[in-house]
């Protein structure tokens, strides 16, 4: 979950380059929409823009508009030896979301 529209816009190229370089052949990245903490942000970028850029580099990248749909979307990609790493910034609900996801797995 990217953090903030301004930082995502500013760091877009770096995010795409670094994430693409880190992903191995069978790795996947799933991303939900940018976390909006309020204020007067210009919402002219989406996490889907990052996903499309990463896909263009030949990587397995997926956008989930509503993170509550994430588990249903990702289930078919998970196996017994999968590693699922959830990351986000400044979203106070992320911890609870992770706990709920773990319980459902």
Sequence positions of predicted segments:
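ATP-dependent carboxylate-amine ligase
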Residues: 1-105
């Amino acid at each position: 979950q990217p953090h903030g529209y301004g930082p995502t816009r500013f760091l877009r190229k770096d995010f795409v380059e670094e994430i693409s370089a880190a992903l191995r052949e069978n790795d996947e990245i799933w991303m939900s929409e940018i976390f909006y903490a309020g204020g007067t942000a210009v919402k002219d970028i989406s996490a889907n823009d990052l996903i499309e850029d990463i896909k263009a580099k030949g990587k397995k990248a997926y956008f989930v508009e509503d993170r509550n749909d994430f588990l249903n979307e990702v289930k078919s990609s998970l196996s017994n030896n999968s590693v699922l790493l959830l990351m986000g910034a400044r979203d106070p609900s992320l911890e609870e979301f992770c706990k709920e996801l773990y319980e459902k797995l």
